[in-house]
Amino acid sequence: MNAKIKAKTRSQMIDELSKMLNIEKKQTKAFMDTYEAFLILELSRAKEVRLGNIGKFKVSVRAERKGINPKTGETVIIPEKTIPKFTFTKGIKEIINAGISIDNERVSIDDNDFDDDDEFVEEYIVSENN
């Protein structure tokens, strides 16, 4: 059984991206800051931002609804609320559910878990193995 892998912090991602791109951390951090600000700006303007083959952010309105105050048991009205949502593409969902295992920082994919119609997953595997 694999040990639980912790999510990377923002600074760890900046460090790794800097190494992968062979650029200074300052440049990578500046790019990430700008990119995040751009995504927020576009989401506030267009109400939807697509991230290539990863997924999309979307602004949704959660309708007014009834709820129960857990302390008093009293029924309360929860007001309408605007919230951001993120939805992954079908391809990413397939990859996540495709029998991927991680051992000592290496990723292996069980090819037997794919259906014939898993185009995106097949493309991903081919490009990763080359």
UniProtKB/Swiss-Prot annotation:
CDD domains: HU_IHF. It comes from the Bacteria. SMART domains: BHL. Keywords: DNA condensation, DNA-binding. The gene is hup. Histone-like DNA-binding protein which is capable of wrapping DNA to stabilize it, and thus to prevent its denaturation under extreme environmental conditions. This is DNA-binding protein HU. It comes from Ureaplasma parvum serovar 3 (strain ATCC 700970). GO terms for biological process: chromosome condensation. InterPro entries: Hist_DNA-bd (IPR000119), IHF-like_DNA-bd_dom_sf (IPR010992). The keyword DNA-binding applies. The keyword DNA-binding applies. Pfam families: Bac_DNA_binding. GO terms for molecular function: DNA binding; structural constituent of chromatin.
